[in-house]
A protein has these predicted regions:
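Non-catalytic, topology-defining segments of multipass membrane proteins
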Residues: 1-190, 194-195, 239-285
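Glycine/small-residue-rich hydrophobic helix-like segments
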Residues: 192-246
Length: 285
């Protein structure tokens, strides 16, 4: 088993044990595990839809066209009740990341940055040298609200306080809240470190301009909503799906297809254009 999988499963196992061990007497260990699991799954799923499917593929790459009410709703819900991610600064960093790809100007990571440096950069990224997030939606009330630094602090204090109120125990709430954010940091490291180091994963396209790799195991693909298929994505960043063969497991694309069935999203003209060198007969979308 690869090291990144060991770390991911270890965090999840430690989270489960901590939920049972620190559960207060009036809840008990098994109910504590159930509460912790519910918090984990809900925050992960909403966060994945928000960041990977909507902000990443919908706004940053304009490959998918979501209903605007859905974009604004999930943005407010995730950033109020889940792990906060500023949509404006994230889109700006991500576009710069694709423009410079592991070279000076990439705010996420340079090719020379190791594990610990990249871990630090997940929390304190390099300064952005340009503003590439000028989309009209960033001027909407919801995006201006959640992008406010005061909101970033207040929302996290609020959702921690709400969790504390619901479970009735400060220690138990702290364990759930903090440990899940460690898991979220691991997800970020999958995307920023392990998929940008040629010692890990596999490369379908030998693009020398960056170090992007595909990591295709079940846990990373599920946890990141397929954002760990970075070599595919960097080769065709405007394509609406991240898997480039039917045999590649693509959890993120499955959720997008489900949202399409619900009438929440459609392909953009650029997102639906299948490059000739991508080994897919069709997008199946």
């Amino acid at each position: 088993m690869k090291g990144y999988n060991v770390i991911g499963y270890t965090i999840m196992f430690a989270y489960a044990l901590a939920c049972m061990y620190f559960a207060p007497l009036h809840i008990g260990p098994w109910m504590g595990l159930l509460i912790g699991a519910a918090y984990f799954v809900i925050c992960w799923f909403i966060g994945g839809l928000y960041l990977s499917s909507v902000i990443h593929m919908g706004i940053a790459h304009r490959a998918l066209d979501y209903k605007e009410w859905f974009v604004q709703t999930i943005t407010v819900v995730n950033n109020t009740f889940g792990v906060y991610v500023n949509p404006v600064t994230w889109v700006n960093r991500h576009r710069l990341h694709h423009k410079f790809s592991d070279h000076p100007g990439d705010p996420n990571k340079l090719s020379s940055d190791g594990f610990w440096r990249t871990l630090y950069l997940c929390l304190m990224p390099y300064k952005c040298a340009a503003n590439m997030a000028t989309d009209d939606i960033f001027e909407s009330w919801s995006f201006r609200l959640v992008s406010n630094p005061v909101y970033a602090v207040v929302s996290q204090v609020f959702n921690f306080g709400l969790l504390w109120l619901l479970v009735g125990d400060l220690t138990f709430a702290s364990v759930i809240w903090l440990t899940f954010r460690v898991f979220a940091l691991w997800i970020n490291m999958i995307q920023n470190y392990w998929t940008h180091d040629r010692r890990f994963g596999y490369r379908r396209y030998d693009d020398e301009r960056d170090n992007a790799m595909n990591i295709g195991e079940w846990l990373p693909v599920t946890a990141t909503f397929s954002a760990c298929l970075q070599n595919n994505h960097h080769h065709s960043p405007g394509l609406l799906r991240l898997s480039h063969e039917e045999c590649e497991y693509d959890f993120g694309f499955a959720t997008v297809r489900a949202m399409k069935a619900l009438g929440l999203v459609r392909a953009t003209s650029s997102g639906a254009k299948l490059p000739k060198d991508v080994p897919l007969a069709s997008l199946n979308f």
